[in-house]
Amino acid sequence: MLFPTALIFGCWALVIEGADNRRPIWNMGHMVNEVYQIDEFVDLGANSIETDITFDDDAMAEYSYHGVPCDCRRWCHKWEYVNVFLDGLRRATTPGDSKYRPELTLVVFDLKTGDLSSSTAYKGGKLFAQKLLDRYWNGGNNGGRAYIIISIPDIDHYAFITGFREALKNANHEELLDKVGYDFSGNDDLSSTRTALNKAGVKDREHVWQSDGITNCILRGLDRVREAVRNRDSSNGYINKVYYWTIEKYVSVRDALDAGVDGIMTNEPDVIVNVLNEGNYRGRFRLANYDDNPWVTFK
């Protein structure tokens, strides 16, 4: 009877695995701006990273760099040339490459558009799309597989998204937009954010992530997070996913999960992993993997 018993238990395991109704969580490593940090943060449990992108006077993406001020207990000056970083990121997210990290499924580009005007934002979006096409997506031929979020701090720079989308369409690679999502990170009111997305050509719930947060040096409540979660879960909302930044205290992580977020941006991904393994959370949440589409609202 050993074989039938083992078979039964195996079948039950498959049923349980297939019926996993826990919310997938994106553990988002913050301020990953040098190539070596990709492995560093993934080793700590991150399945997503955030990278800062700065622009030159011609609206061309130049460095992966944050600068001062930045989070407490972090070094603000790590950097790479954008092309170097994108090459490293492509390798880390391309199956078969010796540097491939299958855990890494989502990348947030925090676009430092502060020195761009509303008009040059459009140009910046076009140029950044072309750079991703060339350096990350390898011209559309077996490039990196991670999902990408274009995150912009200023809703007045919505034309960056317009330019980005148009550039991929004009390059006959509109299919790559299936891998691209959008976020405005300036903590504006949600109705204004929705309007900016619509002006950019992004429909409601079209790969929309809504961030809320502040540097880890300052405490911030969860009122706007809860408002975003209500929008996400409503029948007439515009949001697919909600994430909170930047936290690493255990109590803050628990509070964010209890509020219903889909992602947490952090300097200490191992803290998020530890909380997800706690008794009160491991039955409700799990780390997202590549089979979890970040554009699909969890029900």
From Swiss-Prot:
What is this protein's tissue specificity according to the annotation?
Expressed by the venom gland.
Entry note: cofactor = Binds 1 Mg(2+) ion per subunit.
GO biological process, alphabetically ordered: killing of cells of another organism; lipid catabolic process
Enzyme class, spelled out: lyase
Q: Which residues bind Mg(2+)?
A: E50, D52, D110
Q: Which InterPro entries match?
A: PLC-like_Pdiesterase_TIM-brl
Which compartments does it reside in?
Secreted
Main subcellular location of this protein, as a coarse class: secreted
Question: Cellular component per GO?
Answer: extracellular region
What intrachain disulfides are recorded?
A: C70-C76, C72-C217
Q: Give the annotated active site.
A: H30, H66 (nucleophile)
Q: Which domain of life is it from?
A: Eukaryota
UniProt cofactor(s): Mg(2+)
CDD domains cross-referenced by the UniProt entry? GDPD_like_SMaseD_PLD
As one GO molecular function, the record gives: toxin activity
Its keywords, alphabetically, are:
Cytolysis, Dermonecrotic toxin, Disulfide bond, Hemolysis, Hemorrhagic toxin, Hemostasis impairing toxin, Lipid degradation, Lipid metabolism, Lyase, Magnesium, Metal-binding, Secreted, Signal, Toxin, Zymogen
- Signal peptide stretch: 1-18
Q: What catalytic activity does the UniProt entry give for this protein?
A: an N-(acyl)-sphingosylphosphocholine = an N-(acyl)-sphingosyl-1,3-cyclic phosphate + choline; an N-(acyl)-sphingosylphosphoethanolamine = an N-(acyl)-sphingosyl-1,3-cyclic phosphate + ethanolamine; a 1-acyl-sn-glycero-3-phosphocholine = a 1-acyl-sn-glycero-2,3-cyclic phosphate + choline; a 1-acyl-sn-glycero-3-phosphoethanolamine = a 1-acyl-sn-glycero-2,3-cyclic phosphate + ethanolamine
Q: What is its EC number?
A: 4.6.1.-
Q: Summarize the protein's role.
A: Dermonecrotic toxins cleave the phosphodiester linkage between the phosphate and headgroup of certain phospholipids (sphingolipid and lysolipid substrates), forming an alcohol (often choline) and a cyclic phosphate. This toxin acts on sphingomyelin (SM) with high activity. It may also act on ceramide phosphoethanolamine (CPE), lysophosphatidylcholine (LPC) and lysophosphatidylethanolamine (LPE), but not on lysophosphatidylserine (LPS), and lysophosphatidylglycerol (LPG). It acts by transphosphatidylation, releasing exclusively cyclic phosphate products as second products.
User: Which family is this sequence assigned to?
Assistant: Belongs to the arthropod phospholipase D family. Class II subfamily. Class IIa sub-subfamily.
Q: What is this protein called?
A: Dermonecrotic toxin LiSicTox-alphaIVA1
